[in-house]
A protein has these predicted regions:
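Conserved acetyl-CoA-binding loop-helix of GNAT-fold acetyltransferases
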Residues: 85, 91-104
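Conserved catalytic-core motifs of GNAT/GCN5-like acyltransferases
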Residues: 116-118, 128, 133-148
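Conserved short alpha-helix immediately C-terminal to the canonical SAM/SAH-binding motif I
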Residues: 98, 123-126
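A conserved beta-turn-beta hairpin within the catalytic core of GNAT-like acetyltransferases
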Residues: 71-80, 90, 109-113, 142-145
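Conserved beta-strand in the GNAT
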Residues: 55, 61-70, 77-84
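Short amphipathic alpha-helix that is part of the acyltransferase structural core
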Residues: 2-43, 48-53, 57-61
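A short beta-turn/loop motif at secondary-structure boundaries
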Residues: 44-49, 72, 140-141
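Conserved GNAT acetyl-CoA-binding A-motif
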Residues: 99, 106-119
Length: 153
């Protein structure tokens, strides 16, 4: 039996409160723009309105976040992107739990047989631990080494 942390939320863009949206943008900016030096124009890509947002609120912050990108937007299959855990919440199993919850949601709510993602190479082991397999050579995205991975569902 898996014991899950409380406070996981899964919402469409128009279901997010302004406070939640602000928290998500702030966490994404902290991780992707400040830590990883990705430029704002690449991080804020205009797809959020089409996505489903998975996040964990802890200590008044969005501690962990990812988004589900519908089939046909970016990839021909459904995809998971913008995966993050704030620095102070890392190394606690939160990312793996979030991916498991996200994949369960996709399996229950979408008719697709594959989930695709563009993984930062340093996080490859995390994605493999929840069943993803690498399907590409390493490539650069926003100046960071990535590889395409997928999981059959």
């Amino acid at each position: 039996m898996t014991i899950r942390m409380k406070n996981w939320q899964i919402k469409k863009f128009d279901e997010l409160s302004l406070t939640q949206l602000y928290g998500i943008v702030r966490s994404r900016c902290n991780v992707f723009i400040q830590e990883q030096k990705i430029v704002c124009e690449e991080e804020i890509d205009g797809l959020d309105h089409e996505c489903i947002h998975v996040f964990l609120e802890e200590e008044g912050k969005i501690a962990a976040y990812c988004r589900i990108v519908p089939k046909g937007i970016g990839y021909e299959n459904i995809s998971i992107g913008r995966v993050l855990v704030l620095k102070e919440f890392r190394r606690k199993g939160i990312a793996q739990e979030m991916l498991e919850i996200t994949m369960e949601y996709i399996e229950r709510n979408f008719e697709d047989n594959k989930i695709v993602l563009s993984a930062q190479v340093y996080a490859k082991d995390l994605y493999e631990s929840v069943g993803f397999m690498g399907v590409s050579e390493i490539y650069e995205e926003a100046g960071i080494p990535h590889m395409k991975m997928y999981k059959n569902i």
